[in-house]
A protein has these predicted regions:
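Conserved acidic carboxylate
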Residues: 7
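Acidic, metal-coordinating helix/loop segments flanking the phosphotransfer/catalytic sites
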Residues: 17, 32-51
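A short, hydrophobic beta-strand element within the central beta-sheet of small alpha/beta folds
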Residues: 52, 74-83
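Active-site residues of response regulator receiver
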Residues: 55
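Short amphipathic alpha-helix used as the core "switch/output" element in two-component signaling
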Residues: 64-73
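A Lys-centered signature of the CheY-like receiver
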Residues: 100
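Conserved binding/recognition cores within well-folded domains
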Residues: 112-135
Length: 135
């Protein structure tokens, strides 16, 4: 599985990569972006990843601004230090919402949840007008 990591803090990025490699060594990191602008450009210039891990507070604004700029169907696992954005996250493409510091069991649970959804299920889930929360 190839993933995009949207994270502007080096330590948080490295921690996430370390955990991903421990939990699912077959994961390929397709890219790492640090800002809304960089993420939009990356998504317009590359094949869609299968899953995105996305911080909310980025160097040039909120990750939710990405959804105002491009249509995005890729499922997202939000990673943030703030719990106040959970409802907004599930109004977009979120399949999970992890609070920092992220732990191995958090990533394992998020990947298990992703694995239980096939592509059609994901598209159907993401097309719901107001998902109530995590599966």
């Amino acid at each position: 599985m190839n993933v995009l990591i949207v994270e502007d803090e080096t330590a948080a990025y490295e921690n996430l990569v370390d955990i991903l490699m421990e939990v699912a060594p077959d994961i390929q990191i397709a890219g790492n972006t640090e800002s809304v602008t960089q993420t939009v450009h990356w998504l317009q210039s590359n094949p869609a990843p299968e899953l995105i891990f996305m911080d909310i507070h980025l160097s040039d604004g909120s990750a939710f601004n990405i959804f105002d700029k491009i249509e995005l169907e890729t499922p997202i696992v939000f990673t943030t230090a703030y719990d106040r954005y959970a409802i907004e996250a599930f109004k977009v493409n979120s399949i999970d919402y992890l609070l920092k510091p992220i732990k191995v069991e958090d990533i394992r649970h998020a990947l298990d949840k992703y694995g239980k959804l096939n592509r059609q299920d994901i598209l159907q889930y993401l097309s719901q007008p107001n998902p109530a929360g995590p599966c």
